[in-house]
Amino acid sequence: MNEVFNFSAGPAMLPKQVLRQVKEELYSWNNMGVSVIEISHRSKEFLQLMQEAKQDMRDLLDITENYEVLFCHGGARAQFSAIPMNLLKTSSERVDYIITGYWAYNAAIEAKKYCDPRIINVVGEKNGLHNIQPISKWDVSENSLYIHYCPNETIDGIAVYETPNFSDKIVVADCSSTLFSGPLNINRFGIIYATAQKNIGISGLTVIIIRKDLLKEPCLVVPSILNYKILADNFSMFNTPVTMSWYVASLIFKWLKKQGGLKEINKRNQEKSALLYDAIDSSNFYYNNISLSNRSYMNIPFFLKNSKLNDLFLKESISFGLHGLKGHKVVGGMRASLYNAMTLEGVKKLIRFMKLFSEKYR
C-alpha cells in the first residue's frame, strides 16, 4: 500500500506507534475490559494516567516546582480571553501584544474586549522577504504588566528563535505549534500555553504552564472554567475533562521520551526542515517568502512561481500520497507542516513529488 503522509497544520499527523496503541487499547484499556473514552475521569486508573502525564511533561520540559501544569478543555483561542481576565487587576492596565502574524494579531483583537492592549508590529520586509525584528528592538512599554507573543506563526511560517528576557514583566507565549519540538527555557516565561492538535495529540485539549505566583483570584469577572486558580485547585478537573485527548497526550509524552527527549526531537526537526527548504530554494520553480533567520521549521509555506498550477499540484499530491498541503486562505500557496510525528521519509517523499511535478510542468 502506498504510504500516506499528512502535512496538515492541525489536527496533525500522529506517530504511527501511538495510533497503533490507541487502536489496540480502544476497546479495552489497561486490561479493564472498558475503553479509556468511557471510564470515569475520577477512577484511580485515570487519575494515575493524569499524574503520569503531568510528570512526563515536567520531565520532558524540565519544568521546575514553581510552575503549575494545567490541562484545559478547548483550543488555544479560549486562552486569548483567559489571559487578560486572569492577569489584569483593572481594564486600564497597560499590556503589550507583539504582532508576528495571524495568531498573535487575533490574540490582541480578543484582548481588546478586556483592556486596551498596545499593539506592537515587529514584522518587516526586505528584498521581498518577511522578517521579525530582534527582541532588543521591540518597542516594549516600560510599565506594561505583561507581554504576549507567538514564537511560531503556523499560517505565516515565520518564527522568533530568541527567548525573551523581561524580568520586570510577565511573558506570555502561545507555543501551540512549537511546544515539545525542542528544549525551552521555561523559567523565562510567566505563562506558556499550547493547543494539543499539533505536537501533543488530538484536538480538544490545551496545556498551560503557569508560574505559581500568578495563580491568584482574578480581579475581573472570569468564568469558572477559565479561572486558572480554580483549575489548579481542582487538579484540572473542575469539569469533566476531555479524557480521550488527555489519554493521547499521555501516549505522546511516553513516545517523546522513547525517542530520546526534546534535544533529539529538535535535531530531527531541523534536519527535516533543512531538506525541504533546500529543495524549495534550489528548484527555480517554488519559492518561500520568509527571511532565513525567521523561517519556521514547523510550518513551511511555499509557492509555485506559476500559481495557475496550484490546483493541479494539490490534486496530484493527494494521488501521490501527500495530504494537507494546501496553504491557509489568508496566505495562499502551499504549506507543509513538519511536526514531531512527521518522518524524514515523509519529507523525502514530498521532495520527490515536488521534483517530479516541476520537471513535468516547467
UniProtKB/Swiss-Prot annotation:
List, alphabetically, the Gene3D superfamilies matched.
Aspartate Aminotransferase, domain 1, Type I PLP-dependent aspartate aminotransferase-like (Major domain)
PROSITE patterns of this UniProt entry? Answer: AA_TRANSFER_CLASS_5
Supply the InterPro entries for this chain. Answer: Aminotrans_V_dom (IPR000192), Aminotrans_V_PyrdxlP_BS (IPR020578), Pser_aminoTfrase (IPR022278), PyrdxlP-dep_Trfase (IPR015424), PyrdxlP-dep_Trfase_major (IPR015421), PyrdxlP-dep_Trfase_small (IPR015422)
Query: Does Secreted appear among the keywords?
Result: no
What are the annotated GO cellular component locations? cytoplasm
- Residues bound to L-glutamate: 42
Instruction: Name the Pfam families on file.
Output: Aminotran_5
The EC number(s) given in the record are 2.6.1.52
Top-level taxon of origin: Bacteria
Q: Write out the pathway annotation from the protein's UniProt entry.
A: Amino-acid biosynthesis; L-serine biosynthesis; L-serine from 3-phospho-D-glycerate: step 2/3; Cofactor biosynthesis; pyridoxine 5'-phosphate biosynthesis; pyridoxine 5'-phosphate from D-erythrose 4-phosphate: step 3/5
Q: Which UniProt keywords apply?
A: Amino-acid biosynthesis, Aminotransferase, Cytoplasm, Pyridoxal phosphate, Pyridoxine biosynthesis, Serine biosynthesis, Transferase
Cofactor info, note text: Binds 1 pyridoxal phosphate per subunit.
Where, per the database record, does this protein carry N6-(pyridoxal phosphate)lysine?
198
Q: Where in the cell is it found?
A: Cytoplasm
Q: What GO terms in the biological process aspect are recorded for it?
A: L-serine biosynthetic process; pyridoxine biosynthetic process
Q: Which reaction does it catalyse?
A: O-phospho-L-serine + 2-oxoglutarate = 3-phosphooxypyruvate + L-glutamate; 4-(phosphooxy)-L-threonine + 2-oxoglutarate = (R)-3-hydroxy-2-oxo-4-phosphooxybutanoate + L-glutamate
Q: Which cofactor does it need?
A: pyridoxal 5'-phosphate
Which molecular-function annotations from GO does this UniProt entry contain?
A: O-phospho-L-serine:2-oxoglutarate aminotransferase activity; pyridoxal phosphate binding
Name the SUPFAM superfamilies on file: PLP-dependent transferases (SSF53383)
Which HAMAP family does this UniProt record tie to the protein?
SerC_aminotrans_5 (MF_00160)
Protein purpose? Catalyzes the reversible conversion of 3-phosphohydroxypyruvate to phosphoserine and of 3-hydroxy-2-oxo-4-phosphonooxybutanoate to phosphohydroxythreonine.
Instruction: From the Swiss-Prot or TrEMBL record, give the protein name.
Output: Phosphoserine aminotransferase
Species of origin reads Blochmanniella pennsylvanica (strain BPEN)
